[in-house]
Amino acid sequence: MNYIIKFLNKLNNLTVAIIILLAIALASALGTVIEQNKNTDFYLKNYPLTKPLFNFVTSDLILKFGLDHVYTSWWFIFLIILLLLSLTLCTITRQLPALKLARLWQFYTNFNTKAKFQIRFKTNSSSLTKLTYYLEEKNYKIKHFNHFVYAYKGIFGRVSPIIVHFSLVIVLIGSMLSTTQGRTQEAFIVVNQEKPVLDTYEAYVNDFKIAYNSQGLIDQFYSDLILETRQASKIQKTIYVNEPLNYSNITIYQTDWNIDNLVICIDNQNYYSIPLQFIELPNGSESKYWINRLDLFGQSVFCVVNDLTGIVYLYNQNKDLICISSLGEFITLNGHTITFNKLVASTGLQFKLDSFIPLVYLGFLLLMISTLLSYISYSQVWLVKNGSTTYIFGSTNRAKFAFIKQLTEIANQC
Amino acid sequence: MFNVQFDIFNFSNNITFLTLLISLISYWLGLIFKKIKNVFYIGYGSTILACITITIILGTRWIESGYFPLSNLYESLMFLTWGLLFSAIYLEYKTNLYLIGAIVSPISLFIVSFSTLSLPQDMQKAAPLVPALKSNWLMMHVSVMMLSYSTLIIGSLLAILYLVLIKAQQKKHSLKDFAFANLEFTFPKSTNSTNFNLLETLDNLSYRTIGFGFPLLTIGIIAGAVWANEAWGTYWSWDPKETWALITWLVFAAYLHARITKSWTGERPAYLAALGFVVVWICYLGVNFLGKGLHSYGWLN
């Protein structure tokens, strides 16, 4: 117990907090330099013991400290927990106590103290009213006391950092819960076929379409989707990239697509459904290709499709293009009529069950507002009358330059 | 119609280049020859003009393509320059500190010449958006990110300048000998003038500028996270760009905390801000040259 308290005391220190922040930054950077989530052989091959990267990164080091999965390694999670503790401790032991009015409004009884005022001015004006008026005009709140006037503004600048810490704690805890409790599943669903997905849900795809722009590039993917729950309620929506379906705690995203089958008709009587194989080009080209070999009447031909527009390319064994056909068009091969009737597509969907999204979003919202409000500078001014002269003392926490400029102007007006 | 717009575009490009060059020359003439003070007005004026012409460039592209012009490297660099110039104009108006224009004009000129002269023509053309970018979040996320980058770049540049000047001072060059000395800030002469010297001004100004860039960065990252969650179902996937945005955020968070630590006054936070300068550039450009990850749109195809 004693050790824990000692440890927490050590942690409750701004310098330590800064070191934690920088340590997380460094660890994150490491994860972008070293390829993540590859197999052991990859690291053995690319980070040999004989030639270490930066003179110290070897496959041994990578595998020992989990540098192949930095963001899920025990020490990275330990750093995040340290950050969480440090945030919480700082808020409880420093920020909240400092919010007490008595500490916010510093009523100095003796202005000769060496308290750090950024401003110590003297004016010959004997009345406080004029100064108070100018301060009020600059949006200061004024408190009158027996022997002095106290003015302050920008109290939000004092409160917001607390909300920043609080919302960071919400975001961190929320996303930890999300990753441990939430579930995702990716599935390809063939058009017009029902498929059970996560828990009690079933998804059915009415239609899948690709829209092209005038330059022939993909504009958008559309899946006309029906989600069925156990309570037999049906939700229908056409989803596309950037427009998922939301129902209760399930969300369905458009992520991918595939062409599964090509329906072919020979001599107007026999229909065959030919499975197509997706070919990945080695140079990482954007174009996609689906291909299959057909043995027709003693001749081998390759059918190649690269989108859903219905164009089928036929190649012979020597990889020469024989013909380009569209769906429904009759072509003749060795005296037989062939028609390509239909392309059967499937849509790649991602299903996600996550009940903690609202919590994380709440954290996000608070964080955005509070970091913005933290920009505000908290300024305090004391006006003290002493015989025929008035003293102006001032202090601020952030915008020193603007504050001094403003008060100089006010003082010179009197 | 197309021809007319093309001309406006080319014309604005040339004017931007010219005005930035004039602004660079006049600011530095003013710094080197302390006696000619009016050149600063020429510098300031041409900076404003450059900002306007970049607005026209981006505006015509917006009208032409129908979406916010942030879809490729060229547009993004132009928007960054716009952000740099706009912040510089505002800060200079607020503080009368001509050093700001003097450091922002060379960097802007460099970015503009790089993006118009070095980038291949087809990378400058507005390209149609890929499905993943078709969202209102594009404007929200990317524009806020770019504004935060430009604010943070100016803030950290001021911190670097502070470091340079403080080193010069420590090497027994009194600041008076320095060409910048004539810029020392003085409040209106009166009985109550507080001596706020150049170093203090720079220090506080860089703190305030970074202090403003930081919430922008926070909002930009969060907008990206929410967008990612809407588009592909995860708000954080440790993609290199995301990770470097987080690193930038962490470094500047460390800087802002260093400023309120009593034992970390003066130079030490400024070193963190200088580190931040490097990190922002890695985040903005460096990551994309890896060509990996979710943010590789509109770059080196």
Swiss-Prot record, chain A:
Gene Ontology biological process terms in this record: cytochrome complex assembly
Cellular location(s): Plastid, Chloroplast thylakoid membrane
Membrane topology: Multi-pass membrane protein
Cysteine pairings via disulfide bonds: none
Family: Belongs to the Ccs1/CcsB family.
Role according to the record: Required during biogenesis of c-type cytochromes (cytochrome c6 and cytochrome f) at the step of heme attachment.
Protein name (Swiss-Prot/TrEMBL): Cytochrome c biogenesis protein Ccs1
Organism ancestry: Eukaryota, Cryptophyceae, Pyrenomonadales, Geminigeraceae, Guillardia
Gene name tied to this protein: ccs1
From Swiss-Prot, chain B:
Membrane-related topology note: Multi-pass membrane protein
GO cellular component: chloroplast thylakoid membrane; plasma membrane
Keyword check for Transmembrane helix: yes
Regions annotated as coiled coil: none
Biological process (GO), any one: cytochrome complex assembly
Transmembrane segments: 13-33, 39-59, 73-93, 97-117, 146-166, 209-229, 236-256, 270-290
Keywords linked to the UniProt accession: Chloroplast, Cytochrome c-type biogenesis, Membrane, Plastid, Thylakoid, Transmembrane, Transmembrane helix
Location relative to the cell: Plastid, Chloroplast thylakoid membrane
GO MF, one annotated term: heme binding
Family membership noted in the UniProt record: Belongs to the CcmF/CycK/Ccl1/NrfE/CcsA family.
Subunit comment: May interact with Ccs1.
PANTHER family with a match to the protein in the record: CYTOCHROME B_B6 PROTEIN-RELATED, HEME EXPORTER PROTEIN C
Functional description taken from the UniProt entry: Required during biogenesis of c-type cytochromes (cytochrome c6 and cytochrome f) at the step of heme attachment.
Stated name of the protein: Cytochrome c biogenesis protein CcsA
Source organism per UniProt: Guillardia theta
Gene giving rise to this polypeptide: ccsA
